[in-house]
């Protein structure tokens, strides 16, 4: 991979804060931190457009005693076999379960699947976390 050197102008105070943070995190140099920021910026933009393939997790907490939530969750998971790769089910207590659903597909479709899962009656909380599949990252 060819590297290109470029310069930027930013306020000194902003650079000082940035340097403190990247040192705390453990970056060896600014270039690595800037590369990660640019990658993250590109990935988030691709999610907004919705046409790029992403990977991620949909994590939900639900009360398995409430209505038909278990059946509806399973039905939805079977409806999206191409996008849902795997699931992890954890019993939190006598009534509450945590489910981590690993997904891969077009960003727009993954967001729609997450919305459908999180809006089911009985789901107490849900969160979608998306990342790149790594294919297009440099």
UniProtKB/Swiss-Prot annotation:
Sites binding Ni(2+) sit at 78, 89, 91, 97
The record's Gene Ontology biological-process terms are: response to nickel cation
Cofactor dependency: Ni(2+)
| Molecular function as annotated in GO | DNA binding; DNA-binding transcription factor activity; nickel cation binding
Q: Which UniProt keywords apply?
A: DNA-binding, Metal-binding, Nickel, Transcription, Transcription regulation
The record ties this protein, via InterPro entries, to: Acetolactate_synth/TF_NikR_C (IPR027271), ACT-like_dom_sf (IPR045865), Arc_rbn_hlx_hlx (IPR013321), CopG (IPR002145), CopG/NikR_regulator (IPR050192), Ni_resp_reg_NikR (IPR022988), Ribbon_hlx_hlx (IPR010985), TF_NikR_Ni-bd_C (IPR014864)
Q: Which Gene3D superfamilies match?
A: ACT-like. Chain A, domain 2, Met repressor-like
Q: How is the cofactor bound?
A: Binds 1 nickel ion per subunit.
Q: Which SUPFAM superfamilies match?
A: ACT-like, Ribbon-helix-helix
Similarity section: Belongs to the transcriptional regulatory CopG/NikR family.
Q: What does this protein do?
A: Transcriptional regulator.
Q: What is this protein called?
A: Putative nickel-responsive regulator
């Amino acid at each position: 991979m060819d590297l290109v050197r470029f310069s930027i102008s930013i306020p000194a105070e902003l650079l000082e804060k940035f340097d403190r943070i990247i040192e705390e995190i453990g970056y060896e140099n600014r270039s690595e931190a800037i590369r990660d920021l640019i990658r993250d910026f590109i990935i988030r933009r691709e999610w907004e457009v919705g046409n790029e393939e992403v990977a991620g997790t949909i994590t939900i907490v639900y009360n398995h005693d409430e209505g038909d939530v278990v059946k509806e969750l399973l039905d939805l998971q079977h409806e999206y076999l191409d996008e849902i790769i795997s699931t992890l089910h954890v019993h939190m207590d006598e009534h509450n379960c945590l489910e981590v659903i690993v997904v891969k597909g077009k960003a727009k479709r993954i967001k729609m699947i997450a919305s459908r899962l999180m809006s089911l009656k009985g789901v107490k909380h849900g969160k979608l976390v998306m990342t790149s599949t790594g294919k297009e990252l440099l």
